[in-house]
Design a protein with these regions (language model features):
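Phosphate-binding glycine-rich loop
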Residues: 2-42
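Short, conserved catalytic or adaptor-binding loops enriched in Gly and charged residues
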Residues: 12-13, 144-148
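PLP-dependent aminotransferase-like
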Residues: 15, 34-94, 107
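Hydrophobic residues at beta-strand termini and immediately following loops
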Residues: 22, 65-67, 156
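A short helix->loop->beta-strand "cap" motif at the edges of active sites that frequently abuts
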Residues: 41, 62, 119-123, 149-151
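Active-site phosphate-binding strand-loop segment of PLP-dependent enzymes
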Residues: 70-136
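Conserved core segment of the aminotransferase class I/II
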Residues: 146-183
Length: 183
C-alpha cells in the first residue's frame, strides 16, 4: 500500500507510520472523522453524497453542513462553499471521484477547496475508492498532493472497487504520521 500511494502521490509514504489498514473504507472514513472531530464540531459534506457521510458526521458527534453539487456537471457554487467554511468546520469530506454522481473534481476546483481549507484551518477527509475508475478526458488528482495539503488531508480508500473484492473489506488510510498515529 505504501509503495502504491508513494507512486501515485509522488512522495515517499512510510508504511509503518503513514498507513493504517482498516476493515473497508467505511471504517477508514469513520476512524478519520472520529480522529479529527469532537462533539459539536462541524463537517462540510457535498450533496448528493454516499449514504454514510452524513451518518458518520452525526455518529462522531459533529454537525454536517451540506453543500449542494448542481447538475448536470455536479459543480459546487464557490460562494456557497465559502459560506460553509465561514462556519469554521473542523473537516470537509471529499469523495473524488464522487459517489453517487460520478463527478471528477477538476484541479481548479480542488485548488479552490484547498485554499479554503488552508484559510479556515480545516482538515479534508478524502474518499478515493474510485481513484482508478476515471474516463478521459477526466483525471483524478489526489487532494493530498496539492500544495500545503499533505498535512491536513486524510486519504481513505480500499481495494474493493478497483480489484472487485468487495467482500474482503480491505480499506486503508494514508495520512501524516501525527494523524495516523491517533487512528
Amino acid at each position: 500500500l505504501a509503495e502504491k500511494q508513494s507512486k501515485f502521490m509522488g512522495r515517499s509514504i512510510d508504511p509503518n507510520s503513514e498507513i493504517v489498514v482498516t476493515c473497508g473504507s467505511t471504517e477508514a472514513m469513520m476512524a478519520a472523522m472520529m480522529t479529527v472531530t469532537d462533539p459539536g464540531d462541524k463537517v462540510i459534506v457535498f450533496s448528493p453524497f454516499y449514504e454514510n457521510y452524513g451518518a458518520d458526521a452525526i455518529l462522531s458527534g459533529a454537525e454536517p453542513i451540506y453543500v449542494p453539487l448542481y447538475p448536470p456537471e455536479f459543480d459546487f457554487n464557490p460562494d456557497e462553499l465559502e459560506a460553509a467554511f465561514k462556519q469554521h468546520p473542523k473537516a470537509l469530506i471529499l469523495c473524488n471521484p464522487s459517489n453517487p454522481c460520478g463527478k471528477v473534481f477538476t484541479y481548479n476546483e480542488l485548488k479552490f477547496i484547498a485554499d479554503l481549507a488552508e484559510k479556515y484551518d480545516t482538515f479534508v477527509i478524502t474518499d478515493e475508492v474510485y481513484e482508478h475508475i476515471v474516463y478521459a478526458p477526466n483525471r483524478h488528482v489526489y487532494f493530498a498532493t496539492l500544495p500545503g495539503m499533505w498535512e491536513r488531508t486524510i486519504s481513505c480508500s480500499s481495494l474493493s472497487k478497483t480489484y472487485s473484492i468487495t467482500g474482503w473489506r480491505l480499506g486503508y488510510v494514508c495520512a501524516p504520521e501525527p494523524i495516523a498515529k491517533q487512528m
